[in-house]
Amino acid sequence: MTDLGWPTTIEYSAPLGRRVRLGSWEDQRVSTYSKIQDALDAEEWGFAAELAHYFVDEASVCYGIYRQWIPDLRAFLRENGISTEDLAAIDADILSKLDLPEGRTWNASLQWHLVRTQGEELVRLIHQHQGEAAHAQLVELKETWRRCHDRDVDHTYGLMSAIVERLGEAAISRMWDKVILPLFIWRYEKFDIDKYPWADSLDTLMLVACEAMRGHLVGPERTGDFELIETDDRFILRFDPCGSGGRTIRGDTIEGTPARMEAPYGWTVSEEPHPWNHFQTGVCHYCTHCIRLMEELPMDRFGYPVRVVDPPRYGVTDESGAPVKCQWQMFKDPTKVPEEYYERVGRTKPEVFGSAALGSPALGEVTVAMPGDG
């Protein structure tokens, strides 16, 4: 998938058990939103309709994950002594901050219904060759999904902040072990070199990385476009910002709301050094799931990270004074990941790799409704 001449197609992926968007890596960094715009401009009606269907597919992966995370975060609070009444108050306080710009009370299932129905209307307009109306509908659909996605992220973040406030930062690692183990089994267990050839796994790893960040609507205009660089030994993805943790610590430039550490939210970021924040302060709790999921868990299970993550930190800027971008690195040979990336999560690089070589125990099956197999 390094040939820049590959066309964009929507095809079934056997490793993922569902359809995905294929094309060159240069093409993968272009959002599905932008691809639909281009197809409409070119009057490629059939292709535009296919992409419109897939835009909702991308969104559905993110939406489905939050349907698991939110109840699991609530359950973690209950399992650690938070009463039903206190939990209800926590939820009510979070939700009171998530009203939509027009003043409507936030309702996740209703908002997702709007995403689905607006997607259907977009496809109808495309099939009727109504280019101008389809462009306007696409803008509305993207904005409806952004509002849905961002409030789910806010809901999860408010719960994470409540966990830290009541149980301390040390609870974050236990929290993630409860919340993201299903995601690890569903998506990341397939990146074990003792089970699958890395040459095949790397393509799949890159595909789901690109798909996920398009679905999260990364980028300053929240379209899902990002940077992708290929070097001799790795792929580098950069998000400015990512649509979840990056937006959390920057604030919402579209709706004009501040970083979630500021009023009216007042949610926390890491203030203590831990392996899952690279022993740094200012890492948002949401971003620590990437370190736990993509670095720590696979290092402990396979002997290598599946991605090396450099999250932004609250209040930290680059040399120009601009907010720091989030960066992911995926190595073409996972056994060649430099030692420094192990040290910053308190690990030592092993001499053998793969779950069998390390004697890793078997994991259970996924018990939540996820689309496909990853």
Describe every region a protein language model picked out:
Residues 297-303:
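A structural motif corresponding to the C-terminal end of an alpha-helix
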Residues 328:
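An acidic-aromatic pocket/loop used at catalytic or ligand-binding sites
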Residues 2-293, 304-325, 333-374:
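N-terminal accessory segment detector
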